Amino acid sequence: MEDIVIVGRHAVKEAIVSGHTINKIWIQEGIRKQQINDILQNAKEQKLIVQTVPKSKLDNLANAPHQGVAALIAPYEYADFDQFIQSQKDKEGLSTVVILDGLEDPHNLGSILRTADASGVDGVIIPKRRSVALTQTVAKASTGAIQHVPVMRVTNLAKTIDELKEHGYWVAGAEADNATDYRDMAADMPLAIVIGSEGQGMSRLVKDKCDFYIKIPMVGHVNSLNASVAASLMMYEVYRKRHQVGDNA
């Protein structure tokens, strides 16, 4: 796999701090050093290559706003599913994973990773086919959360769900019909939340594997939410049910 370019101050900073392999950092000419002091300091401590370049070079490297900073890094590695399951056996508290069935928008995946990190979700599972991969755009949208949330890429989602069930997980599918209000769902057990694709929802095989279905009430004129918005509401509902007000653990 080829190295990839990431852009933006948050994404680059988190890549450095997390220990990701970084081959080069580009800084825009004329940028105020105090705006990127943390990046420069961390890069110096790790003896990383830093080059000052014209804005035009960063514009050519990036397909998104770059804030005057970019980096060439090693490809993102996917977490191993079996190792992840083992790690969850040793953790305190109840495990939560999010399964994305056919999500193809990189901005949605990045946003979901950002909320997953913020709400304490333990991991995200995506299929190898019909799904966006971990790309520069995903990294930018996640504002660095891509470095902290394990993402597992599996061949067969239905089989993976069976394995999750064997390890005690209950599987909740986001579904509009014949579903429980997400505010009434149980969260006192290891939980896997399935979010379907933006256009088609969950595939039939995956849908049939769910233990129960949850929905978000819609009282306006539109009948659906963006996948990342729906996922965020559900992730934080799990957090709300498991933590008292003032408990930031």
UniProtKB/Swiss-Prot annotation:
The keyword Signal does not apply. PANTHER family: 23S RRNA (GUANOSINE-2'-O-)-METHYLTRANSFERASE RLMB. It comes from Staphylococcus haemolyticus (strain JCSC1435). Gene3D superfamilies: 3.30.1330.30, 3.40.1280.10. GO terms for cellular component: cytosol. Pfam families: SpoU_methylase (PF00588), SpoU_sub_bind (PF08032). Keywords: Methyltransferase, Transferase. This is Putative TrmH family tRNA/rRNA methyltransferase.
